Amino acid sequence: MAAKDVLFANDARQKMLKGVNLLADAVKVTLGPKGRNVVLDKSYGAPTITKDGVSVAKEIELKDKFENMGAQMVKQVASKANDEAGDGTTTATVLAQSFINEGLKAVASGMNPMDLKRGIDKATEAAVEKLREMSKPCSDKESITQVGSISANSDRAIGEIIAEAMEKVGRNGVITVEEGQGLDNELSVVEGMQFDRGYLSPYFITNQENGSVELDNPYILLVDKKVSSIRELLPVLEEVAKSSRSLLIIAEDIEGEALATLVVNNMRGIVRATAVKAPGFGDNRKAMMEDIAVLTAGTVISEEIGLELEKATLEQLGSAKKVTITKDTTTIVGGAAEASAIADRVASIEKQIETTTSQYDKDKLQQRVAKLSGGVAVIKIGAATEVEMKEKKDRVDDALHATRAAVEEGIVAGGGVALTKIAKELADLKGDNDDQNVGIRVALRAMEEPLRQIATNAGDEASVVANAVKAGDADYGYNAATGEYGNMIEMGILDPAKVTRSALQFAASVAGLMITTEAMITNHVEDKELDI
């Protein structure tokens, strides 16, 4: 087993604190509308310029192992806030730095670390409750635009395009962000269910101009296995031919004789049939096939449930108003299902979203809900250079997450004002003893720090701004972008309550751990002597 280095008590905490401050000082300069840029060196290509706190935090690894432990713990705060609410990473880092600095000063002066932690936890719980009381619902387009604009570093164009996307696909709709080709941002909405599988043969193409297959009012046959023998398909093909309607076959794969016969029938005009592979892989494929079955009021022909392809009937086929297939995608519009069947399926998937812990699985399930609900919006980012494109895409991702969080838990006054007001309201909060009271004061002082940092980044005197804001009424605050004081809600400076809540909770959590740390252990690194 490798030798270890061990540090105890104040020596350990001071090393850890140095790492915390190194990371937090690099991240906090990006906070607010006048936040500064940070340039990140890359091992290849041009440097990246960013104002995204979590991007800065992810880049930092320190040489000293003990200092690095402190930095990594604060990095975890930023990542957790990002995972929970998709934004608020810089706020969480600023809060954590203040909690830890003030908390460790109290420990150094002889306070009981456990009581300090209890005091911090008590103040945090009370603040979260106040946040819930303060939050106002965010449902209209203008509020969503304002939240998106603030999160995208006061870029109103980004806020507007996100609000428009949400209006078109609904709150549960999937909105994806891609790199565009031009200089302007573009929004496109794909109606119906789309999945990334194209036609299996170019001979199926019906629209030669754009190279796509267009089927009007087709039957849809869903099969969960490979089809290579035409004998299995013949009975259902004959039934479809009698009905004079076209047919879309979605199967695990269609190859050999079966595919060749479909192509020949298509070219001769006997049966207008087109084949595509089923979307997804493994269990996800089965789930998506079931989704398509629900949407089109059909049945998945599966031997697992005793259904054979040779015995398939027209009643087991789904149908839709229109299907468009390109070489890469298939879009089903106007499935024949009743609204109640789709609603039941969506409710079932939403229950899975609540129980799953994997973010990847959540995203996949959310996409399935959106496809069933009828829409996917794609925001294409326009920029002049690759560096600008990356920076802008980061901001749009942040803004998108922030607007979702705002719709979920409501909005509060932005610019660090909500936490500053809460700190003022909780001034009389008391713990069970003097050390807990110090912990409460540490937490209340930390809650003012985001406002102070926003003012500092804007070139203003932090204490003057903080005192002026505390002297005002409920939503009175400071607009760092213009240098004006006023009602933050009316000025459109809003923060999602969920972002503020998660930033505070995660910062308090990691601060409690650091304050109560008494020893640090890391692998010993021996200095290698140079051979001369």
Curated annotation (Swiss-Prot):
PROSITE patterns: CHAPERONINS_CPN60. It is an enzyme of class 5 (isomerase). Coiled coil: none annotated. Forms a cylinder of 14 subunits composed of two heptameric rings stacked back-to-back. Interacts with the co-chaperonin GroES. Belongs to the chaperonin (HSP60) family. Together with its co-chaperonin GroES, plays an essential role in assisting protein folding. The GroEL-GroES system forms a nano-cage that allows encapsulation of the non-native substrate proteins and provides a physical environment optimized to promote and accelerate protein folding. This is Chaperonin GroEL 2. The gene is groEL2.
